[in-house]
């Protein structure tokens, strides 16, 4: 049965804390060996500790009188080889009688602890260089407020970028935009040369200017620009939202009016009154004291009015109306005094007066003869003659 020693104390060491090494006795002690017959059964079943002292009657031949010297040599080798994971020890010769005894194989295991620090060894010309790969702090030291428990600032906390942001924020908080560099160094808890590094850059790009040796003033956009820019962005966003809501309201109104017009077109009762009278047209300001023609033509009809300047003197005005889909109705509307009577006398049987039902108007409907339905209508006028006096039909 293998005996193990898990003692936390090393008697050869002067310090008093838990040893990082653990010793295991791998070779079994046979009870049949006469050399070990003097040991009591209780001593073989309990953990073997090197620090235990045996009676003088049991030292020979089990252990040599020079056991203390031999054991000190073993412990010295163990201390020198502390970084090794395994140490195998052979037999130790008896210094006096020439006898040798088997001590057993001792395995030295270094127990891990939170205080251990990982290191990487790199070989160089100058020798072995110790490279630091990581650092761990014990939880107890952090809780007890040791040296390792102090807060360590990261690189970003001491960067010029962060200091510049804090510096600009101090300028924003200043009433007139003027800042004392000494006060700034005290507030930011940095050396004054770091403040000078920031001011040199900001002065170089034209954002600040020095009023005195230790005072600077912001010379960028009013109210530091950034604040105004944020206000302007917020204002523009609100305007866009307002315009979008107004556009949505107008779209709803247009949709409602389109639906109302569609319902009027589909209503038979409303379609009976969907027309304009002569008074509705001539009452418009731009159509007063003008000669007006009302044309009712089918779909795909077109009107051509040649340029009167292309004609020979005197100027003549022509209007060509053509349609291949059906007849064309032309109504002459005029408010000149005596135009209606003169036109009726000259046209005679070639024209008849026709007005919408229930409307008393002197409008004149121009019609063609029954034998010349395919002819175009040509309307010509002189400066002294009315337009209706010169109308005639020509063969196409």
From Swiss-Prot:
Residue ranges under compositional bias (Polar residues)?
A: 34-48
The UniProt entry's GO biological process terms, in alphabetical order, are: cell division; cell morphogenesis; DNA endoreduplication; glucosinolate metabolic process; negative regulation of cell division; positive regulation of programmed cell death; regulation of transcription by RNA polymerase II
Which keywords describe this protein according to UniProt? Cell cycle, Coiled coil, Cytoplasm, DNA-binding, Repressor, Transcription, Transcription regulation
| Positions of the UniProt region annotated as Disordered | 34-57
For molecular function, the Gene Ontology terms on record are: DNA binding; DNA-binding transcription factor activity; protein heterodimerization activity; RNA polymerase II cis-regulatory region sequence-specific DNA binding; transcription cis-regulatory region binding
- What does this gene product do? Involved in transcriptional repression. May act by repressing E2F-regulated genes in mature differentiated cells, but is not an antagonist of E2FA. Restricts cell division and is involved in the coordination between cell proliferation and endoreduplication during development. May play a role during the transition from skotomorphogenesis to photomorphogenesis. Regulated by phosphorylation-dependent proteolysis via the protein-ubiquitin ligase SCF(SKP2A) complex.
Family annotation (PANTHER family) = TRANSCRIPTION FACTOR E2F (PTHR12081), TRANSCRIPTION FACTOR E2FC (PTHR12081:SF51)
Which family is annotated? Belongs to the E2F/DP family.
Protein name in the entry? Transcription factor E2FC
Q: Which species does the entry assign this protein to? A: Arabidopsis thaliana (Mouse-ear cress)
């Amino acid at each position: 049965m293998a005996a193990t020693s898990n003692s936390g104390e090393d008697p050869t060491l002067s310090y008093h804390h838990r040893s990082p090494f653990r010793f295991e006795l791998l070779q079994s002690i046979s009870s049949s060996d006469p050399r070990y017959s003097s040991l009591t059964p209780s001593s073989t079943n309990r953990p073997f500790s090197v620090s235990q002292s045996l009676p003088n009657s049991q030292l020979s031949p089990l252990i040599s009188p020079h056991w203390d010297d031999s054991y000190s040599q073993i412990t010295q080798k163990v201390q020198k080889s502390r970084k090794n994971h395994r140490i195998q020890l052979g037999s130790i010769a008896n210094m006096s009688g020439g006898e040798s005894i088997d001590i057993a194989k001792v395995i030295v295991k270094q127990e891990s602890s939170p205080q251990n620090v990982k290191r990487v060894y790199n070989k160089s010309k100058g020798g072995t260089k110790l490279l630091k790969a990581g650092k761990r702090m014990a939880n107890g030291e952090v809780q007890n407020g040791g040296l390792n428990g102090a807060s360590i600032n990261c690189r970003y906390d001491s960067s010029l970028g962060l200091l510049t942001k804090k510096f600009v924020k101090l300028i924003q908080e200043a009433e007139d935009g003027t800042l004392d560099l000494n006060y700034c160094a005290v507030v930011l808890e940095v050396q004054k040369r770091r403040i000078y590094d920031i001011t040199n850059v900001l002065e170089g790009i034209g954002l600040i200017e020095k009023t005195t040796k230790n005072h600077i003033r912001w010379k960028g956009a009013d109210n530091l620009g950034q604040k105004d820019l944020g206000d302007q962005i917020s204002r523009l966003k609100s305007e866009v939202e307002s315009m979008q809501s107004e556009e949505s309201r107008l779209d709803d109104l247009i949709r409602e009016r389109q639906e109302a017009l569609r319902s009027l077109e589909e209503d038979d009762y409303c379609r009976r009154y969907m027309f304009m009278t002569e008074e509705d047209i001539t009452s418009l300001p731009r159509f007063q004291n003008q000669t007006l023609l009302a044309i009712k033509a089918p779909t795909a009809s077109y009107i051509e009015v040649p340029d009167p300047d292309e004609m020979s003197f005197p100027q003549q005005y022509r209007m060509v109306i053509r349609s291949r889909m059906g007849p064309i109705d032309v109504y002459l509307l005029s408010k000149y005094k005596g135009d209606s009577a003169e036109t009726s006398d000259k046209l005679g049987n070639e024209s008849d007066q026709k007005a919408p039902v229930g409307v008393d108007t002197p409008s004149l409907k121009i019609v063609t003869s029954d034998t010349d339905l395919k002819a175009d209508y040509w309307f010509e006028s002189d400066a002294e003659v009315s337009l209706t006096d010169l109308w005639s039909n020509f063969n196409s």
